[in-house]
A protein has these predicted regions:
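Non-catalytic cap/lid and distal C-terminal segments of serine-dependent acyl enzymes
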Residues: 1-123
């Protein structure tokens, strides 16, 4: 497994609350699948133009420290903001972000990373 290898070979804090997984586009969809299947491994989840989470998707909300979902304004942003609001209403630390004037492109994802980074690993 990759996570044990990283923890063994790099200076990490080998705890779930000190790990995040994020992906863009298809990598976001894979991030969604992995974080839902293995909530004990990652505390923070990020989907950048990679779909959404709903409160019903997450079996144990206490496992999740933060969720970030984003897309470009040309990608159908209503679903992103609705999902973020539903997660917040269910008690999750969640943030939705829409990159203005962009689509499914690297400018969207660079802006998304800038918005997501400050919410990671907060106490």
């Amino acid at each position: 497994e990759l996570v044990p290898y990283i923890d063994a070979n790099f200076k990490t804090i080998a705890k779930k609350d000190s790990r995040a997984m994020a992906g863009l586009s298809m990598g976001g969809m894979e991030t969604r699948n992995i974080t839902l299947a293995r909530p004990e491994v990652f505390g923070y989840y990020g989907l950048l133009s990679g779909g959404t989470y709903s409160p019903e998707d997450i079996k144990d909300p206490s496992q999740v420290k933060g969720i970030f979902i984003s897309c470009g304004s040309k990608e159908g942003p209503d679903r992103i903001m609705q999902a973020a609001e539903a997660l917040k209403a269910a008690g999750f630390n969640a943030k939705g972000y829409v990159s203005p004037g962009t689509g499914h492109e690297f400018l969207t994802w660079r802006r998304s990373l800038r918005e997501m980074a400050p919410m990671l690993f907060q106490k």
